């Protein structure tokens, strides 16, 4: 597998509560736009479901379509992600949805992770194969 690394920034974040739970806990939906730089360059559009807990932590899952270039190859692909927020840091794991690659990225397979401290972005690592 080939490894890619880089950074991402949050370009837009639209989040709304759809269910209030006991105390400060709640369920929300977020529509987020990301910008990517490094071995992966482009833009991602994500929709996620989140569960915030009373203790200030959260868990989330979502889908993100990324359009851009990976190692100089152009196209798009979809990621399925899960993650958790605790101690001021969001840690996310994701995998490429099989069959979602387009253009030069058709046949893309792989998985990765990202870390973001409270702020506008973070870093990612991505291990992939192009079949």
Task: Locate each region found by the language model.
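Targeting-peptide/extracellular-domain and disordered-appendage signature
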Residues: 1-131
């Amino acid at each position: 597998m080939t490894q890619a690394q880089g950074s991402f920034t949050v370009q837009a974040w639209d989040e709304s509560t759809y269910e209030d739970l006991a105390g400060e806990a709640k369920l929300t939906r977020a529509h987020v736009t990301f910008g990517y730089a490094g071995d992966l360059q482009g833009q991602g559009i994500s929709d996620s479901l989140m569960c915030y807990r009373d203790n200030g932590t959260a868990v989330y899952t979502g889908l993100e379509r990324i359009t851009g270039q990976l190692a100089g190859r152009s196209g798009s692909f979809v990621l399925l992600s899960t993650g958790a927020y605790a101690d001021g840091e969001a840690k996310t794991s994701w995998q490429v949805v099989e069959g979602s690659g387009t253009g030069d990225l058709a046949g893309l397979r792989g998985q990765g992770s990202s870390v973001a401290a409270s702020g506008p972005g973070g870093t990612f690592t991505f291990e992939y194969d192009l079949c």
